[in-house]
Amino acid sequence: MVHRPRLLCLHGGGASSQIMRIQFSKLESALRKTFQLVFLEGPLDSAPGPGVLPFFKDFGPYSCWVSDDRSLSPEEKRQEETNAIAYIKTFMLQYGPFAGILGFSQGARAAASILLEQQREAFTHDSLFGVFFCGTFPPFIPDAPDISLPTIHVLGLTDPYLRESEVLLEHCTQQSVRRVIKFNGGHHMPTSSDVTQQIADVISMTYRTSQRKRVSGIWKKNVVDSRPSALEI
């Protein structure tokens, strides 16, 4: 069987891995020959999120990565965020390798947090990139630097969270690959087959680019490591 690189998929707050699989069915079909999509369930129970009802009223229970409980103290909120990051990292280490992370809405915040963790202190040898669908802001890491790993941003032009998606884009450095796809729609996955195929093509291109850079980096490191030191004769 031909190995297909895995893409980790993180659903929105108040949804579920099952709901996300339905929402991403067109994209999964477009990527099927190239990638395997893996859908992870959020760690916390949740009420239904934006846009979930009434269509997914029979698809509970619902979950999230961090809660919207305003009664939590800053310390409790920070602990939720830390737990979410640890939960996702543990899954990735157990079921990886993963080539990239796809996140919808709150799932994009979670995906951005994992990219920032990988930047800060690599926890996996995977060469990661992120795809943010109708992403919200901020990540689960306070005072985070800009994301320098490759990212793809899918923005709905009538999404009520569009400004948050734009802020997330602004916090991804232009020095790396940073691609933007806009569609006529709100806080949901694009329904157009043309837009879906465009997203699939950009994901494939970003993966190929990241792999070339990874191989080039390994080759350069091996060349440097193979050079004699000043003490060798």
UniProtKB/Swiss-Prot annotation:
The active site is at S105 (charge relay system), D159 (charge relay system), H187 (charge relay system). It is an enzyme of class 3 (hydrolase). Transmembrane segments: none annotated. InterPro entries: AB_hydrolase_fold (IPR029058), FSH-like_dom (IPR005645), LovG (IPR050593). It holds the Pfam family FSH1. GO terms for biological process: secondary metabolite biosynthetic process. GO terms for molecular function: hydrolase activity. Its EC number is 3.1.2.-. The keyword Cytoplasm does not apply. Keywords: Hydrolase. Belongs to the LovG family. This is Esterase FUS5. The lineage of its organism: Eukaryota, Fungi, Dikarya, Ascomycota, Pezizomycotina.
